[in-house]
Amino acid sequence: MKLPLLAFFILLLSSGAGAQTVDALGTFTPYSLFGIGEIEKQGSAMNIGMGGIGVAVRNNRFINYLNPASITERDTLSFMMDVGMDIKNFYNKDNDVSSAYNAFNMRNIVITLPIYKKSALILGFVPISNIGYKFASPETDPLIVSKYGDIKYYKYGSGSVNKLFVGGALNIGKKLAVGVELIDYFGTLYKHSDVEFSSDNTIRTIVSGNDYTISAFSAKFGAQFFTPFANDKYLLTLGATYSIGRDLGGDITDYSYATDATGISVDTLYHNVNSNNTIKMPGELAVGFTIKRQNKWMVGMDYTYQAWKSTSFPPVRGVDFEATASHSLKVGVEYTPNMYDVRYYFKRVTYRAGGYYEKSYMKVNGKNLSAYGITLGCSLPISRLNNALNLAVDLGERGSLKDNMVRERYVQFIINVNIHDLWFIKPKYD
């Protein structure tokens, strides 16, 4: 039976347009049904506040982990740590059905340390993608209903793909920095499809699912070329990164079993474990530039390409889905009135704004899924040195009300705490 993507989109816990808090889900969107789910926007609140740029960002106050080469821009005696989280509100609409939900997610934990002069070490944890959806649709064919009784089809999923990484970077001469990261991808994706039969006051369910265990290693390379101009008043930075594509490995567990009215399994239809997980994370190429006046303002742009068309995902019953190449274009700006002002606090605040356009790796019902949005952000200085509270908001939209698709509007609030301390000062006296 072929169904529209979100026909009768109904949260299992509730229906209608009331907002719901989704516990333990890093996202809540019907589009996470496909592939490895919703790809998370990378970067801290500093990056997201500028539309997500970071490939050519060099900042000695905050950690920019979008390009491993950027961590050489730092105080050589400093320890830096960045911890972030976000909350995202989704408003989904499909013809006459609408729903609103909230999802909370840990965003990043990243630490950088100096090694020797203009070289540094970085380690961290970052979510790559999230799955979170719950919806249902009833059987509407009168012949099937008359023969088998009322039938409901449920789809629900959860899980995430994450990465642990450790990297290093160094300056080569006065105008070039290079860096490399070693990456460990890990996580589990759960996708379930249930069929519930109701007849003669008896409810029976056939529960089917696919559990994907992710385990793979990869690497990311980065470089930044930076040169002053206009009598050293401004700095131009060109950046590039490349992540190696990898099979995500791990096991796939396929299962199906029948339950009685109490939900207890009464018959296992099949249970297979396959170690040949063919899901692939394709290579990613990103380039960008920034122009800045130190401690005053910066403007920049990033472009990212990822060849998802070369990977394959299990089909989704009733939906025409295929993977395609993804593209994104991001622009951003930041401005600090006077970071050394001792009288007016808000002159020391850094203000940010940006925008983006993304063509997702998902092609649904023959149509490319695109998103666009605007972002705002700021850095609020805390205490001494460069400790700060970084805030950002992302307002965007993707999908449409045409071609049996879903229009999704979202607001994402991001908060990062930046810790900056001097750990490696030699004492003057014994």
Over which residues does each language-model region extend?
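Sec-dependent N-terminal signal peptides
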Residues: 4-13
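Sec/Tat signal peptide C-region and signal peptidase I cleavage site
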Residues: 15-19
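Subset of outer-membrane beta-barrel
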Residues: 20-430
